[in-house]
């Protein structure tokens, strides 16, 4: 079984965690932006079928 030889420093842990969190932030921002464009009807990359209420 693979075991790390030495303990990872706190600063290295913090850097890696911040990279991980920042990636999540940008993904969430992109998803929210896409949702806003779809809901407002200004989306250029998605075709949403509108159901007619009759």
Swiss-Prot record:
Family the UniProt entry places it in: Belongs to the bacterial ribosomal protein bL32 family.
Record-level Gene Ontology MF annotations: structural constituent of ribosome
Name of the molecule in the record: Large ribosomal subunit protein bL32c
The keyword Repressor appears for this protein: no
Gene Ontology CC: chloroplast; large ribosomal subunit
A family per Pfam: Ribosomal_L32p
GO biological process annotation, one example: translation
InterPro entries to which the protein is assigned, alphabetical: Ribosomal_bL32, Ribosomal_bL32_plant/cyanobact, Ribosomal_zn-bd
Organism: Piper cenocladum (Ant piper)
UniProt superkingdom: Eukaryota
Keywords of this entry: Chloroplast, Plastid, Ribonucleoprotein, Ribosomal protein
Subcellular location: Plastid, Chloroplast
Keyword field contains Ribonucleoprotein: yes
């Amino acid at each position: 079984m693979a075991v790390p030889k030495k303990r990872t420093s706190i600063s290295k842990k913090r850097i890696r965690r911040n990279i991980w969190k920042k990636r999540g932030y940008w993904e969430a921002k992109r998803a929210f932006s896409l949702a806003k464009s779809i809901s407002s009807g200004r989306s250029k990359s998605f075709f949403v079928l509108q159901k007619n209420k009759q």
